[in-house]
Amino acid sequence: MLTVLVVAFGGLGTAQVATADVSYNVGYVSEYYFRGILQKNSSASAGIDYEENGFYIGAWGADVGDGIEYDIYLGYGIETEAGFSASLGYTTYQYTGDTFDDEYNEGNLNLGYGIFGLEYSKGTCECFGAESDYDFIGLTLSFDNGLYATAGFHGDESDGEYFEFGYGTTVAEIDLGASIIFASDELSGEVDSDGNANEDTALVLSIGKSF
């Protein structure tokens, strides 16, 4: 699943310039994690985004082994002259085939100020005919030197938490990243010799390009 980032344009109490922008992205990760949950041991992805006057819509797809995940999202974002940003959106996560996962639909709220970012998402999973509700809270610190740290917490009918520490930079217009993820046993696919769930730790490397 694609992590929906804060999209911020224009400003409160200021005139907004009529601008439109289309961008594309491709990427590859050594291990595809989303909100602390392993999706696939290496995955390629691609996406397209359209933004105009604070409104955004986009699509993103990734290889998940047993088919393709494709996400569609839309919303509206603002940023004030004081540096506060906010966005409100909707995301649907879909999968080809019927073996990897089922449909997820959620609303997303993102807030940001300085190095601080907050995500709150509330959604429903079809879960192969057994509908369930979930929510997610993510707290992120992002620094100008490329370092970041995230703490994520699953709630409602889901459970678990994870912590991610990473670094991202751009070299010759290529985006490079590395992160370490620590996930609780509720989110882990790891088991011990007795078959009990273990906490999960992973080193993830990424490379990408935006156009």
Regions found by a protein language model. Name each.
Residues M1-F211:
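Outer-membrane beta-barrel proteins
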